[in-house]
Regions:
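Binuclear metal-dependent hydrolase catalytic cores
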Residues: 1-171, 175-183, 237-268
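Binuclear metal-ion centers of metallo-dependent hydrolases, dominated by the metallo-beta-lactamase
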Residues: 178-268
Length: 268
């Protein structure tokens, strides 16, 4: 998921949530030309294995022989400490283990991503991550027995006792949201234009919300519009739309929920 703030062509802030193996093709298709931060939900391959392709946005310096006279070409390093990568301890451990070369001394000829990993456990509603004008609060969740992180992104947030703000919650790969996290989401629910929530399929699953479970949680949070993500292929997009429409018709309250899709653009 790519979040931007400001001009769509030259965004003031550019944030990525997760970086799957097809990140490069998605970045080219969406014309992503800079990043300010990467937020990780967890370290499973479909959410992390495109990490090496982030080097175009933040990279170490390198040198390589060129020509026949033993000349060496120098490639300058990106300024600063490196692109910040936020995640819980599990996700960051996966980063350091599976991409260990990133954190080792630069080898001759080898440019690589320049990253700064940051444990998100130190951030909260009282102490959000601030990137540009966007405030970001980590939301602890469970994906089976694995602790994952959802992300609450807010514009105009002034802290606890907040006044009007608006935002989006991104809650993928979960089958349980702890009570404290759910209470946090409920507090911000009236200010959320969008909720993107895990909903794998109609049948129950051991590590993902089903459609009905996702609807139940989405109703409790109360965002203006909810979207199901991480969908499997048991049903087509249209079939899921019809299923949700039938479920929503049984509710007495005004509630909107649709299946998400590749290339979906949401505005807050």
């Amino acid at each position: 998921m790519w979040i931007t703030d400001g001009d769509s062509q030259v965004p003031a802030t550019s944030i990525l949530i997760d970086i799957g193996p097809d990140f490069r093709s998605q970045a080219l298709k969406s014309s992503i030309n800079r990043l300010d931060a990467l937020l990780l939900t967890h370290g499973h391959a479909d959410h992390l294995n495109g990490l090496d392709d982030i080097r175009i946005f933040s990279h170490t310096g390198s040198k390589a022989p060129c020509g026949v006279n033993g000349q060496v070409k120098l490639y300058p390093e990106t300024e600063g400490d490196g692109l910040p990568v936020y995640g819980n301890s599990n996700a960051l451990q996966d980063v350091h283990q599976r991409f260990s070369y990133i954190f080792q001394p630069v080898l001759e000829g080898g440019g690589k991503p320049k990253l700064k990993t940051v444990d998100c456990s130190v951030f909260s509603e009282d102490n959000p991550i601030i990137i540009g004008d966007i405030s970001i609060i980590p939301v602890p969740m469970l994906h089976g027995h694995l602790e994952t992180i959802g992300w609450l992104l807010l514009k105009g947030y002034k802290g606890v006792g907040f006044g009007p703000c608006r935002g989006i919650a991104y809650l993928t790969d979960c089958n349980k949201i702890p009570s404290e996290s759910l209470a946090l989401l409920r507090r911000f629910g009236p200010y959320l234009q969008h909720l993107v929530i895990d909903g794998l399929r109609q049948r129950p699953h051991s590590t993902h919300f089903s459609y009905d479970q996702a609807l139940e949680v989405a109703l409790e949070i109360g965002a203006k519009q909810s979207w199901l993500t991480h969908l499997c292929h048991d049903m087509s997009h249209v079939q899921i739309q019809c299923y949700l429409a039938d479920k929503l018709s049984q509710l007495k309250q005004d509630f909107q929920c649709q299946p998400a899709y590749d290339g979906l653009v949401l505005e807050i």
